[in-house]
């Protein structure tokens, strides 16, 4: 059976693994998921990620990050634009997550980026997810 929303599946796996304090989480790899993982790494939400080749599409192994007393770094993660209801934001309507404490991941014409970079470059796009 095919998966209707692979990005939501990735975000749910991260949310669930973080809630039970797993060190790593495996998700099926794709270019879009690699871009999202790279944003999470650059913004300090995960420690790192590896792409494991398995002869098919590959596996993306994310190393989750926790504080000194094992408190979660990712406290919330939410899918915004879904296959049944796409959500777009113009360049002057890009949302702020928790007043700038979180990030919005946006798919723009210049690639997948954060809300801060999209605002700086003056581009809008599809709002994929909020992470805080």
From Swiss-Prot:
Keyword RNA-binding: yes
Pfam families registered for this protein in UniProt: Ribosomal_S8
One cellular component term from this protein's GO annotations in UniProt: ribosome
InterPro entries according to UniProt: Ribosomal_uS8 (IPR000630), Ribosomal_uS8_sf (IPR035987)
GO terms for MF: rRNA binding; structural constituent of ribosome
Top-level taxon in the UniProt lineage: Bacteria
GO biological processes: translation
Functional summary from the UniProt entry: One of the primary rRNA binding proteins, it binds directly to 16S rRNA central domain where it helps coordinate assembly of the platform of the 30S subunit.
The protein's assembly and partners: Part of the 30S ribosomal subunit. Contacts proteins S5 and S12.
Family membership: Belongs to the universal ribosomal protein uS8 family.
Designated name of the protein: Small ribosomal subunit protein uS8
Organism: Alkaliphilus metalliredigens (strain QYMF)
Lineage: Bacteria, Bacillati, Bacillota, Clostridia, Peptostreptococcales
């Amino acid at each position: 059976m095919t998966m209707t929303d692979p990005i939501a599946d990735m975000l749910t796996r991260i949310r669930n693994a973080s809630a039970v304090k797993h060190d790593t989480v495996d998700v099926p790899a794709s270019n879009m998921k690699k871009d999202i993982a790279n944003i999470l790494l650059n913004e300090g939400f995960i420690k790192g990620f590896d792409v494991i080749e398995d002869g098919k599409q590959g596996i993306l192994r994310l190393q989750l990050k926790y504080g000194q007393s094992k408190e979660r770094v990712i406290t919330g993660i939410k899918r915004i634009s879904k296959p049944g209801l796409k959500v777009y934001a113009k360049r002057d309507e890009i949302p702020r997550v928790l007043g700038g404490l979180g990030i919005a991941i946006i798919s723009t014409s210049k690639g997948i980026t954060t809300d801060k970079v999209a605002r700086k470059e003056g581009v809008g796009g599809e709002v994929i997810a909020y992470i805080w």
